[in-house]
Amino acid sequence: MLKRFVRYSLFLALGLLVLGCQSTKPMMYASKKITGLKTPESVVQAKDGRIFISEINAFGQDGDGRISVVDQHGNVSIFADNLDDPKGLAIIGEYLYVADKTKILKINPNGQVSVFVSAEAFPHVPFFLNDLEADLQGNLYVSDSGDLFNTGKGGAIYKITPNGEVKLLIKDTQDTRVIAPNGLLADDTGNHLIYVDFSSGVLYSLNTSTSTLSDLADGFGGGDGVVHHSSGVMYVSDWKNGKVYSVNMMGDLSLVKGGYQAAADIAITKDERYLLVPDMKAGELDFIALDGVKP
């Protein structure tokens, strides 16, 4: 259950954020599942309706990662390639930002890639940069899931200013609940950051000023992505168990859809009609209709 002393204010702030971002642009392609992707991890939609998908391809194989784009008719093409292990995506203005292993990339509208934040710009060289989130002030937030495959240590969350300065918000040595931070969701003020932990499956709220954590909900297995609907409903994906859950304003968890091989970093379309779910192991992008969503 959501902790009621933080739930109301956080959902109110998130509701204001999403209401300001809605679009009525029709989704001509939305019923068409995208197949044939190479280890899709994250997805984000631009204001013009295009959908960008990060494709890792082979983990640890540098240079074989790419970003694909789906146009308004459902046609898929390569937007940028020769990446390493691209994961989280965020859009600020006309630029696409990508969390790629230990660095943050910036891609212009023509698909030209540059390094926005190098590994050396972080207080500590990251282990496994994962999700990426932007706030309304133009800041980026990135999760470092830590040394997932060995020690299980090193989890952290960072804030990146518009000019590329990096600030540590929280790390595992500050709070033992920080294990493998993954999916991120910022409110409209930048004062709170909701995130789900991949190892514990717990959903948290992080106060970005005080670096204090509040438990919101649990039971998400291998928590991967988290998004918010203007009705007040949040959606969380469980990578390990191939499921997507909803959490309503009362704190009730419901299974939205299961059967995925690995439900990765989800997104909501600008018109809020569909939930976008990359199935990493299946190589697909699924569209879940959100008709009749209630708070």
Regions inferred by a protein language model and the residue ranges of each:
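Glycine/small-residue-rich hydrophobic helix-like segments
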Residues: 200-204, 208-258
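A short beta-strand motif characteristic of beta-propeller blades
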Residues: 28-34, 74-80, 113-123, 165-176, ...
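C-terminal motif of bacterial Sec signal peptides marking the signal peptidase cleavage site
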Residues: 18-20
